[in-house]
Amino acid sequence: IIRTLPNFKIKKSLNYSNTNAPYLSEEASRFMCESGIQHLLIDLPSVDKEKDKGELLAHKAFWNVTDVNTLNDDARLDCTITEMIFVPDEVKDGSYLLNLQIASFDNDASPSKPVLYAILNTKI
């Protein structure tokens, strides 16, 4: 989960169009790919810059896609990016269990409902 600061609640209703909102570098996305991160949740409108001429470098790096027309064998099609999330300050940084509820659309994008659960420290 990437939560940007300041974490104002107004993020939930901001119109990001034509604002050149922050985004991830291709290198940052590649690092996450190489680190084995499967599900990226971010509170920005996109991991890529708003006007990138369709390059989508951060998306492609995260999914390890070299050519969208002919997918490479090692493309990470089981991974997801969820953009425009809001994580309230009450959710502290740390490890959580993620229930990522994804609509079963046959499309390259789908709405999702990520739910975080605290990991209980219990002794057996």
Language model regions located:
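Active-/binding-site microenvironments in catalytic and ligand-binding cores
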Residues: 1-124
